[in-house]
């Protein structure tokens, strides 16, 4: 079953689903700055575009481009800066 989610007044939209027992979501973020909370560990992969990310425990912002991925621990939060619409894939670990 597909779960459609909308965050930040419609600036971030995602579709969540299960594939072979794994929870995943795909989505698009419009330009802006966002803070996301995590319940479970996540692996984010940039599909198209780029994002600047400040992960928990990191002082510096990191830039991730299409094809790059990064992990975020569960029960934490991370900040994202988007300069132009960016597509992503999120795997819940």
Curated annotation (Swiss-Prot):
Residues that span the membrane, as ranges: none
UniProt keywords, alphabetically: Glycosyltransferase, Transferase
GO molecular function: guanosine phosphorylase activity; purine-nucleoside phosphorylase activity; thymidine phosphorylase activity; uridine phosphorylase activity
Coiled-coil segments: none
Primary enzyme class: transferase
InterPro entries cross-referenced by the UniProt entry: Ppnp, RmlC-like_jellyroll, RmlC_Cupin_sf
HAMAP family: Nucleos_phosphorylase_PpnP
Primary role: Catalyzes the phosphorolysis of diverse nucleosides, yielding D-ribose 1-phosphate and the respective free bases. Can use uridine, adenosine, guanosine, cytidine, thymidine, inosine and xanthosine as substrates. Also catalyzes the reverse reactions.
Name of protein: Pyrimidine/purine nucleoside phosphorylase
Protein species of origin: Photobacterium profundum (strain SS9)
């Amino acid at each position: 079953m597909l779960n459609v989610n909308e965050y930040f007044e419609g600036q971030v939209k995602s579709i969540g689903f299960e594939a072979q027992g794994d929870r995943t979501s795909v989505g698009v973020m419009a330009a802006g700055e966002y803070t996301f909370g995590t319940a479970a560990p996540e692996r984010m992969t940039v599909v198209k575009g780029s994002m600047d990310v400040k992960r928990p425990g990191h002082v510096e912002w990191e830039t991730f481009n299409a094809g790059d991925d990064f992990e975020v621990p569960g029960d934490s939060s991370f900040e994202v800066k988007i300069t132009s619409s960016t597509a992503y894939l999120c795997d819940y670990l």
